[in-house]
């Protein structure tokens, strides 16, 4: 069962939903897709709730769907789990036994400017206890940056948070936690009806340098699974001893500090956004949402059979801020410059800020291509 929402629904997922006769909630997004010629199986609110009570598994495209769940879904256990995972401070408390040395605390927003900034253990991350995207998030390294962050929150946070319900972005409390140094990774997983976790994707989020915060490049490979799958799986098993999740998908971001994987945040009831999760479709031919809804457990041996030496990557190719509205992505040049472009998805809307997304494959002989991608000047790919 699917709830399709902005910002983006791929044609791959649409076709998967049609082929597998998946119930889709009737809303503005799904109706627009049907109007574009795709015969989705749409259910109104009452029909969708009734189907959920029979099927028991639900997938949402983004945080935008959470408001509908709160209003319509009579599954308080599920709603409580979502609320718990959305609350970053509560999540840190749950993980405290696993990470006893990790610093964090929670404060009322009105009390932030009264904190003795010179007593804090920098570097820190300051963010809403309940948040969405990067709204209200600040990385602070010293007292001056702390004071600047507090001023920004006081002046601008309520303007941003007012666009979302309290369930999506909380406005009362902020979490202060240690900044986690190390490489960034992400995992798509689901817990089956017995609470057993299955990992469907492991990504390495690569950056050009320490100041880079873009989503330009995510990579996956058999070597990545060999190195990190056990560590991530151990975390999931320990987490579910507390949460008791079942029939539940999630996307988790980690930092690996050289000794252990530390979770940054969890996104409940969905996998990686903007179709990053569909990298698995190119690796194994299986859509991860199908795997979750059909209870398919995929081993890394099955996933990477015959592709053990390859790296599969997902690219978000930003549209230059100064690109003219009539400029479009140069698909031919991009294909010529890359070893193996598996799929290219140009975005025509200049307001999105993304020129295209791409799925690519590289082998050992072309590893340098990935580093080159991190430094691409996107002006070279606009015509």
Specify the residue positions occupied by each region the protein language model found:
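Short, charged N-terminal beta->alpha structural module
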Residues: 1-37
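Protein kinase-like catalytic core scaffold
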Residues: 124, 198, 262-265
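Glycine-rich phosphate-binding loop of ATP-grasp-fold ATP-dependent ligases
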Residues: 124-154, 184-188, 208-224
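Conserved metal-phosphate-binding beta-hairpin within the catalytic cores
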Residues: 240-277, 305-311, 315-323
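Peripheral (often C-terminal) accessory segments that flank ATP-dependent C-N-forming ligase machineries
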Residues: 293-383
């Amino acid at each position: 069962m699917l709830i399709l929402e902005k910002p983006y629904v791929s044609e791959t997922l649409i076709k998967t939903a049609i082929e597998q006769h998946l119930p889709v909630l009737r809303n503005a997004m799904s109706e627009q897709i049907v109007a574009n010629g795709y015969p989705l199986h749409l259910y109104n609110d009452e029909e969708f709730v009734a189907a959920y009570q029979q099927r028991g598994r639900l997938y949402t495209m983004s945080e935008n769907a959470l408001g509908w769940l709160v209003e319509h879904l009579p599954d308080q256990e599920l709603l409580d789990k979502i609320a718990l995972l959305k609350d970053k401070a509560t999540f840190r408390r749950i993980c405290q036994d696993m990470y006893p040395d990790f610093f964090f605390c929670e404060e009322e927003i009105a009390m932030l400017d009264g904190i003795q900034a010179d007593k804090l253990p920098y570097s820190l991350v300051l963010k809403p206890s309940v948040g969405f995207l990067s709204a209200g998030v600040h990385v602070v390294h010293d007292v001056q940056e702390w004071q600047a962050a507090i001023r920004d929150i006081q002046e601008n946070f309520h303007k941003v948070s007012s666009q979302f319900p309290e369930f999506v972005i909380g406005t009362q409390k902020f979490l202060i936690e240690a900044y986690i140094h190390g490489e960034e990774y992400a995992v798509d997983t689901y817990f089956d009806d017995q609470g057993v976790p299955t990992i469907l994707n492991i990504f390495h989020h690569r950056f050009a340098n320490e100041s880079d915060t873009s989503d330009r490049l995510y990579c996956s490979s058999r070597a990545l699974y060999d190195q990190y799958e056990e560590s991530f799986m151990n975390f999931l098993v320990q987490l579910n001893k507390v949460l008791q999740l079942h029939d539940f998908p999630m996307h988790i971001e980690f930092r690996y500090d050289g000794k252990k994987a530390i979770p940054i945040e969890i996104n409940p009831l969905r996998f990686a956004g903007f179709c990053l999760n569909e990298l698995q479709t190119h690796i194994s031919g299986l859509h991860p949402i199908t795997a979750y809804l059909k209870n398919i457990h995929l081993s890394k041996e099955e996933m990477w059979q015959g592709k053990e030496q390859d790296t599969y990557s997902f690219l978000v190719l930003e549209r230059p801020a100064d690109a003219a509205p009539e400029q479009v992505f140069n698909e031919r040049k991009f294909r010529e410059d890359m070893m193996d472009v598996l799929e290219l998805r140009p975005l025509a809307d200049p307001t999105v800020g993304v020129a295209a997304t791409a799925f690519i494959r590289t082998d050992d002989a072309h590893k340098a291509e990935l580093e080159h991608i991190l430094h691409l000047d996107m002006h070279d790919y606009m015509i």
